Structures are given as structure tokens and as C-alpha cells.
Amino acid sequence: MDEIINKYQAVEKLFKEIQEGLAAYDQYKTLISELLHYNNHIKQEYFNFLMIISPYLIRAHSGETLRNKVNNEIKRLILVENINTKISKTLVSVNFLLQKKLSADGMKTKNMWCTNNPMLQVRTAHNLFKQLCDTQSKTQWVQTLKYKECKYCHTDMVFNTTQFGLQCPNCGCIQELMGTIFDETHFYNHDGQKAKSGIFNPNRHYRFWIEHILGRNSEQELGTKQDPCGTKVLQQLKKIIKRDNKCIALLTVENIRKMLKEINRTDLNNCVSLILRKLTGVGPPQISESILLRGEYIFTEAIKIREKVCKKGRINRNYYPYYIYKIFDAILPPNDTTNRRILQYIHLQGNDTLANNDSEWESICMELPEIKWKPTDRTHCVHFF
């Protein structure tokens, strides 16, 4: 957390140095205005980050026992929210802006960016501007900021209220308008329709399914108004097990799903892991928080890539347990038999659907360096009880 705060403060200080260094030169007024946009943006990101972690900081000071838990939660937020990536993207944009202006002013920039550190690249560009300013005389002409002109193809941009900014009709580039409020009509009910959130959050789906796959969901989900604790359901399942002479220790996810279908309780398919734990006394593995966080990050990236590469015309909804299965199958070592038991608690769909999912997953893996593609192997049902 301290590292992120220091990074935000260092970026703000660097932006301030650049603006102060160019303020005396009239020919750079347009550039300063453009840099101000990124300066405001990084300040807003810094403020948002502090707002996110502030409740956890308050909890951390309330007791020693909560401190480790709070620190882990803040680390998870930093990873999931891609804080480092957001800072780097802003620095890359600023570096591109400076490099473009330097090239326009006749300064050779080729081969000057030999580092992958965006912070160092921006500082290098700043130093080059100092050299350029020393060799040029101050001029008094004034430029006007053409904020509606696309910086890539110089086409007039149009307002796009869904993206909260200007969009180029030619290349599709979007320029965010900081501090501008649009009519948010999509947040109001029309003709009795239910208002929906316009923000898709893959992390919420990941946490929901991980909670259910690991059997950490509430036991009240098994119940009804007449049977709050789900005792009746468990009794019905035990009768079927006894009738069919099934070995409780060898029960699988597919066994439980078939029995739930028989008693017309397929609404409990999401609770199979919890039911298995109640019946067998053996639950899913308790995977460490670091592995779960890594899985959450890869899951988020995979869903984003899927939205870009998904096959046209395919209307099937995302089956998120499949993604979780593929991720943990890839990141858990083959000899880690304890944690790999999680694969036994994930239901895989039919062969045709699985083949389609594997084909789509192969396309995702091409843009996901963390995962190496391989076809799904159904022989994971080897028991380690």
C-alpha cells in the first residue's frame, strides 16, 4: 500500500515539474493544457484509491487481530483493481504526447527510449525538453486548444454520452472529458422497468462461484420456509444413497446433481460442494488466499479478452465455473494433489458444449500469457479422499 501511495505522489511531483518547466514558453501552452488533463486524471485515480482503502485503514486501527486481514484485503484490491497498470498507462500516454511534440520540434527521439520503465521514459522526455528550451528563444505567439480534434487523425470528434467523452468517428479514439456531467437517463426507471447497473464486474462472479465451489456459502441456502436448515433435502438424499447402495466416500458432483434432479431440487446445483461436505464429512480443499487472488486476476483478464474474441453468432452465456476450472488446472502444479481436489467440485458441461468452450478458451489463451492452452481432460475424477 505504501508503495502505491509513494508511486502516486512521485508521478504527481513529476507532472508538476514538467508543467513548471514549460510554463515560461508560449509555444508549449497547448502541451501544458494537454498535460493538465493527465495530471487531473492521476489525481482522481489517487483520490479513488484512497477512498477504496480508507474503510480498511479505519478497521486496521480498531484492533490488532484485524490488521493482517485488512492488509490482505488491501493487497487484493491493489491486484484486482490493476492499480499499477492504471498508473503505467497514464505515464505511457504522457510519454507518447511528449515524444510526439519533441519530434514535431525537430528533436531526434529515435532509440532514446531504451527502457521499459514508463516513469523513467517520461523523465527522459522532460530532460530533452529542457535541452530544447535552452536552444530556442522565447516566443510570444499563442495557440488555441482544439479539444474536439482527434490527436491521431485530426478529425473533429463527436460527443459520446455512453463513454462520457468525445469519440473520433474515423479511428474510434475516445477522449475522456474530465469534470463533465452528462444526462444519465439510463439510471432512471421507464415504464415500470427495473433499473440495472451498467457496470459489469467479473470479480463479483468469481467470488460468488469460488465461495460455492469451496463450500463456503451459507447453509441457509439449502433451506426453504418450511425447512430453514435444509434437513429434509439431506434426508431425501441419504435415502437415495441407501436405496442405490452408494458409497458415501465416493460420491461425486455428478452423483449429487442427479439426485437433486430426482427430488426436483435442481435449484441447489450451485450448492453441491456444501451438500457433499454435509453428507461425507469431507469438504473441498482450503486453498490459500494468494492462489485465490492469482486466480481472480487471471479470471478477470480472461473475461475481458473473451468479450473481444468471442465467436460471432454464439449466444451461449458465460459458464464461469468452466473458466475457474481451466485457470486452476493450469496454475496448480500436477503434484499438488491436495489443492487440485478443487477440480472434483466443478461441474463440466456436455461434450459438445465443452468442445466449443475449449475452442474459445484457446483463442483467449493466445492473449493470456499466464495460461498455456490444453484440452480439457475429464479424467480429473480421481479421488483423493
UniProtKB/Swiss-Prot annotation:
A zinc finger (C2H2-type) spans 166-190. This is Zinc finger protein B385R. The keyword Metal-binding applies. Pfam families: A2L_zn_ribbon, Pox_VLTF3. InterPro entries: Poxvirus_VLTF3 (IPR007031), VLTF-3_Zn_ribbon (IPR014900). One of its GO terms (biological process) is regulation of viral transcription. One of its GO terms (molecular function) is zinc ion binding. Induction: Expressed in the late phase of the viral replicative cycle. Keywords: Late protein, Metal-binding, Zinc, Zinc-finger. The keyword Zinc applies. Belongs to the asfivirus B385R family.
